[in-house]
Amino acid sequence: MEEIQQQQQQQQQQQQQQQQQQQQQQELTQEQIMEFKEAFCLFDKDGDGCITADELATVIRSLDQNPTEQELQDMITEIDSDGNGTIEFSEFLNLMANQLQETDADEELKEAFKVFDKDQNGYISASELRHVMINLGEKLTDEEVDQMIKEADLDGDGQVNYDEFVRMMMING
């Protein structure tokens, strides 16, 4: 009885994963899908519809992504849904959809940082933060602005650099 329930749970999980994957794939444009298919086929030497982990690394790098070895291992573990050690095109497509979403988030953070960094010197000062907060309708005291800077300023230089800004945004989401 318990075994049947476990099988049903596994089937439900697989169906949910497939639905998520289909949704992610739908967010890709036809042009993106064709570009990914082209790259995938270039490295699928024997034409069996699968690529190895090493080939995956080469494909991803050919698409201007530069993951570390650990990131590659994590990707493979995450996307090799059937656990056969090779990557089918549908699994590859899911990976690339995820990568694009992460890239979009990075771009949004860079744009947000530029809004705060008025003089474009790579740092957000207390006065720049105060200026943006006032424009957003936030009436903060000097102490509150200083406190915000202090919380985000990990290296203690009195300003917030991009890495500190990203960390702050990830924590406060």
Curated annotation (Swiss-Prot):
Domain EF-hand: 31-66, 67-102, 104-139, 140-173
Entry keyword NADP: no
Naturally occurring in which organism (per UniProt): Arabidopsis thaliana
Cross-referenced InterPro entries: CALM/Myosin/TropC-like, EF-hand-dom_pair, EF_Hand_1_Ca_BS, EF_hand_dom
Amino acid composition bias (Low complexity), ranges on this chain: 1-26
Binding positions for Ca(2+) 4 per the UniProt entry: 153, 155, 157, 159, 164
Chain residues that bind Ca(2+) 3: 117, 119, 121, 123, 128
Keyword hit for Repeat: yes
Annotated spans, Disordered: 1-27
Chain sites annotated for binding Ca(2+) 2: 80, 82, 84, 86, 91
Protein name: Calmodulin-like protein 11
Family annotation (PANTHER family): CALMODULIN, MYOSIN LIGHT CHAIN 1, 3
Source organism superkingdom: Eukaryota
SMART domains according to UniProt: EFh
Family: Belongs to the calmodulin family.
Keywords associated with the record: Calcium, Metal-binding, Repeat
Family matches, as CDD domains: EFh
Function: Potential calcium sensor.
GO function terms (MF aspect): calcium ion binding
Sequence positions that bind Ca(2+) 1: 44, 46, 48, 50, 55
